[in-house]
Swiss-Prot record:
Belongs to the bacterial ribosomal protein bL34 family. This is Large ribosomal subunit protein bL34. One of its GO terms (molecular function) is structural constituent of ribosome. NCBIfam families: rpmH_bact. The keyword Ribonucleoprotein applies. GO terms for cellular component: ribonucleoprotein complex; ribosome. InterPro entries: Ribosomal_bL34 (IPR000271), Ribosomal_bL34_CS (IPR020939). It comes from the Bacteria. Keywords: Ribonucleoprotein, Ribosomal protein. It comes from Nitrosomonas europaea (strain ATCC 19718 / CIP 103999 / KCTC 2705 / NBRC 14298).
């Protein structure tokens, strides 16, 4: 059986990257929440 997680840098960046997050209001909220929490990594 094939596993569900098949890593790919491109698809990872395109869905969870910083620039993608900044495009939408919800994505910006995610970045803001992670900054407030003090995360070292804000996005992938």
């Amino acid at each position: 059986m094939k596993r569900t997680y098949q890593p790919s840098v491109i698809s990872r960046k395109r869905t969870h990257g910083f620039r993608v997050r900044m495009k939408t209001r919800g994505g910006r909220a995610v970045i803001r929440a992670r900054r407030a929490k003090g995360r070292a990594k804000l996005s992938v």
